[in-house]
Amino acid sequence: MANNIKLSILTPQKTFYVGDVKEIITRTVEGEIGILPNHTDLVAFLTPTETILVEEDGSRKKVFTSTGILNVGESEVSFMCDASEWPDEIDIQRAETAKERAEKRLKTSNNIDVKRAELSLSRALARIKTKND
């Protein structure tokens, strides 16, 4: 039995993170999920969220993860997501502006793409939470 999980977080632009962790807490379309070593195999769709990585020494790292796919194997986990950022990489003003813009679009009924606006709002809120927590 492995005591750690080999984690990879990949975005279209780069390999964002590769390392060993003890636990991962994230959110899928089905809800929040905690992943420990020897977790049941799983493939799930990710939603924008603050993901928590618990390192070998018990310390916690926060990371923003966007929409994508989560692949869980016995001792390996892969995030393949549109974007991923550490809290210090998040432009809080840009996230606040995106939040306000999405909220305005959702309040108007002028032929908007509601799903797109909801997703924009979700991404902005997750970035803000990751930066401010």
Curated annotation (Swiss-Prot):
Claim: Ion transport is one of the keywords in the record: yes
Q: Which InterPro entries match?
A: ATP_F1_dsu/esu_C_sf, ATP_synth_F1_dsu/esu, ATP_synth_F1_dsu/esu_N, ATP_synth_F1_esu_C, ATPsynth_dsu/esu_N
- Show the CDD domains listed in the entry: F1-ATPase_delta (cd12152)
Which purpose does this protein serve, as stated in its record? Produces ATP from ADP in the presence of a proton gradient across the membrane.
Q: Which Pfam families match?
A: ATP-synt_DE, ATP-synt_DE_N
Give the species this sequence originates from.
Answer: Clostridium acetobutylicum (strain ATCC 824 / DSM 792 / JCM 1419 / IAM 19013 / LMG 5710 / NBRC 13948 / NRRL B-527 / VKM B-1787 / 2291 / W)
The protein here is known as ATP synthase epsilon chain
Q: Where in the cell is it found?
A: Cell membrane
Report the GO molecular function annotations: ATP binding; proton-transporting ATP synthase activity, rotational mechanism
Q: Does the keyword DNA damage apply?
A: no
Q: Which gene encodes it?
A: atpC
| Family in the record | Belongs to the ATPase epsilon chain family.
Q: Which UniProt keywords apply?
A: ATP synthesis, Cell membrane, CF(1), Hydrogen ion transport, Ion transport, Membrane, Transport
Reading the lineage from the top rank, the first entry is Bacteria
Supply the NCBIfam families for this chain.
Answer: ATP_synt_epsi, PRK13450.1
- Subunit structure comment from the entry: F-type ATPases have 2 components, CF(1) - the catalytic core - and CF(0) - the membrane proton channel. CF(1) has five subunits: alpha(3), beta(3), gamma(1), delta(1), epsilon(1). CF(0) has three main subunits: a, b and c.
What's an example GO cellular component term for this entry? proton-transporting ATP synthase complex
How does it sit in the bilayer? Peripheral membrane protein
